[in-house]
Amino acid sequence: MADLFALTEEALAGMGIELVDVERAALGLLRVTIDREDGVRIEDCEQVSRQLSRVYEVENIDYKRLEVGSPGVDRPLRNEAEFRRFAGERIEIKLREAVDGRKVFTGILQEADTSADDKTVFGLEFEAKKDDIQVLSFTLDDIERAKLDPVLDFKGKKR
């Protein structure tokens, strides 16, 4: 799958589109998830679908259906660049090891800093108890999974 990811990423180079994920699903479905700084439009999905159809045909990639879409409002965060990009946003993280009996934290992602051992350290500002704001420091190695967790109003717009 790593080769397919690299091939897809190379095919999208220069389009201003970030490749988030490539997934093989049941019944020959190949699901490609893309993102852009200002959000994915339907035209982006169409353009990527046409581009990848040609590339996959030339490279003999076996699939029956190609699905191109956005990661959605609760997109996963997987690497340092994504964490840096979404600093200031509300996220949910699940830690590999519990801190104060908790593994799951939701709060505002803070800018990265570098620790004494040159690891990138992020902060998560969260409400431990009512009106008790704390900051959890973590590295990417500490995280099992992370995703955006925006608060949406009843009209579906991010607040």
From Swiss-Prot:
Keywords (A to Z) from UniProt: Cytoplasm, Ribosome biogenesis
Pfam families documented for this protein: DUF150_C, RimP_N
CDD domains according to UniProt: YlxS_C
Main localization category: cytoplasm
The keyword Phosphoprotein belongs to this UniProt entry's keyword annotation: no
Family from the record: Belongs to the RimP family.
NCBIfam families xref list: PRK00092.2-1 (NF000929)
UniProt name for this protein: Ribosome maturation factor RimP
Lineage: Bacteria, Pseudomonadati, Pseudomonadota, Betaproteobacteria, Burkholderiales
